A protein has these predicted regions:
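Short beta-strand-to-loop junctions in surface cap/lid or active-site-entrance loops
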Residues: 1-5
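C-terminal cap of thioredoxin/glutaredoxin-like
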Residues: 6, 12, 19-32, 93-161
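Structural alpha/beta surface segment adjacent to cysteine/selenocysteine redox centers
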Residues: 8-96
């Protein structure tokens, strides 16, 4: 959690997006540099062009509920092409590989318990001008990494002060 001295960083992400997989390097670097002083929050922005992105966002929410959200996010983003081919079967397999309750993951995808969270994130993203992923919001300033990730980490660090 943030101690209040640094602005919160929202990481608007889509789990079938190869650019988001690359953006994890920036997230890791920020975590390494700032540790627990920096709050990085995952926000979902599934894109229509990716068939399994909405289910993947729901699965990520379930993984956070089971206490392994960031590990799950990284594991799925490392396999974006496979997600495109295998869909929900991969999402459940990744949960199992990470020691999560895979049966509960499957149930969460079936019963849609996380749909409202994903829908709310997507609606808020549209409202603030998110058009692609990855996008960051740092202290109210939006940085669109979907256009170019060149120099993005440096711009985030500059906004953190």
């Amino acid at each position: 959690m943030s101690d209040g001295s640094l602005p919160r960083v929202e990481f608007w992400c889509e789990l079938q997006c190869p650019d988001c997989a690359s953006a994890l390097d920036d997230v890791r670097a920020l975590r390494e540099a700032y540790g627990d002083r920096l709050e990085i929050v995952l926000r979902h922005f599934p894109l229509d062009k990716h068939k399994h992105a909405f289910a993947a966002a729901q699965a990520a929410e379930e993984a956070f509920e089971q206490g392994r959200g960031w590990a799950y996010l990284e594991a799925v983003l490392a396999r974006t092409e496979e997600l495109g081919r295998r869909g929900e079967a991969l999402l459940v397999d990744v949960a199992r590989e990470l020691g999560l309750d895979a049966e509960e993951m499957d149930t969460a995808l079936i019963d849609g318990r996380h749909i409202l969270v994903v829908d709310a994130d997507h609606a808020e993203g549209k409202a603030i001008g998110v058009t692609g992923t990855p996008t960051y919001v740092v202290g109210g300033t939006r940085l669109d990494g979907g256009q170019s990730q060149e120099g993005l980490r440096e711009r985030i660090v500059a906004l953190l002060g």
